[in-house]
Amino acid sequence: KTNAGKKNLPDSVKILRLWIDHGQAPVDDTYGYTVYTGKGTPSARLPFRVLRNDSLVQAVQSADKKLLQAVFYPGNNGLQAGGVSLAASEPCTVMIKMVAGKSVFTVTDACMNAALKKITLTYNGETIEVPMPQGEFCGRTASYELP
């Protein structure tokens, strides 16, 4: 009932809550999850490919290769998979979407480091400097279009 008393919002909504117990001390365990929205049973064939899923980089790419999403954690050594080479100078999230034949990059400094002025990406050998939002906009996404 978080919306109780607020105009134009429902008092309550149904949400998904999920708890998965991996035990007290899992060692060298690997797992991944896919959450689908909507009604019905999803296709057994995933609409994406997991490029990497470890403690340094998590990345997926759509089956049609028009969308790539990656999370780079501290100490990461970049991503080399699925015909893609992508590295980031700082921990961040990166989305690359193909739009009208151009690569559109959306980058977020998830750490909200106010001192961070830019994140440098290396994408298939090309260096891209993405200025990070400053001041009150720190933590917002920044976009860059590669012609």
For the regions a language model picked out, list residue spans one by one.
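Beta-strand/loop-rich accessory regions of lumenal/periplasmic or secreted enzymes
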Residues: 1-25
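Non-catalytic terminal regions with compositionally biased, polar/charged low complexity
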Residues: 36-147
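Short Pro-Gly-centered flexible turn/kink motifs
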Residues: 26-37
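Short beta-strand micro-motifs in enzyme catalytic cores
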Residues: 14-16, 29-31, 58, 103
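A structural signal for short secondary-structure junctions
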Residues: 10-12, 24-28, 99-100, 112-113
